[in-house]
Amino acid sequence: GSLILSGSTLYGMTSEDGAGGSGTIFSIPTNGSSLTTLYSFTGGNDGGSPFGDLLLSGNTLYGMTYGGGTSGDGVIFSFPVDGTATTTLYSFTGGNDGGNPYGSLILSGSTLYGMTSEDGAGGSGTIFSIPTNGSSLTTLYSFTGGNDGGNPYGSLILSGSTLYGMTYGGGTRGDGTIFSIPTNGSSLTTLYSFTGGSDGANPYGSLILSGNTLYGMASSGGTSSNNGTLFSYVLQGSGLTSLYSFSGAGPDGGYPEGSPILSGNALLGMTSSYSPAGGGAIFEFGL
């Protein structure tokens, strides 16, 4: 996952190791003077192997783990920044509630929204909401792996009362989708199905929204040997535009698995492999 900043302190997680063997929550000042391990996951009821980001609200961190919990299908947890232990708000069962969340939570008011990458009634992941006190989880949608998509690995974004996200698989060609759904879960709309051509395929990260335009990356597809794309999608407009196809051979690298960020009139992001050094690249793309 990524780091989050509060004042002069960064918070983050590791997916492995630690005293409990299943990852950690840590803090470090922005000057890097010393790292503090705030919590070590055990892989038991507290969860284990977090792959997403933390969310800070007030004095409380919220997050998810991919594994652990009472059924081994991951948990939603809270952790006070001045505390010593996490509180498990929910343990996924791998049933209709889904299992194995890969992304991060978002917060609106006192409600958390997120996705699981697997299971659910449709067998291909879920969208859910849960109050910050963990009183009850509501499954807003279950992906089927068909035209609606399946197996989301990124996170949701919220605009007004509408959630937007992507799935890695499913859609009309099995190459993933872009979707929207109201926060009440009344109906999911597939905005776009990736074809695996110049538009890309299998998005692994999350979308960002600027004005009425969504930006994101697909981990494969494109015009350059299937090495992924950077794209835009205009809401209620012209649809999807492939902005760039990664070469997998030049300094741009290939297989972007995260999400871009917008700075001024430029998108910045990373690729996971290739590039002259062989380990991926950091890029900037002017809009």
Task: Please provide the spans of the model-predicted regions.
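Extracellular beta-propeller repeat domains
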Residues: 1-287
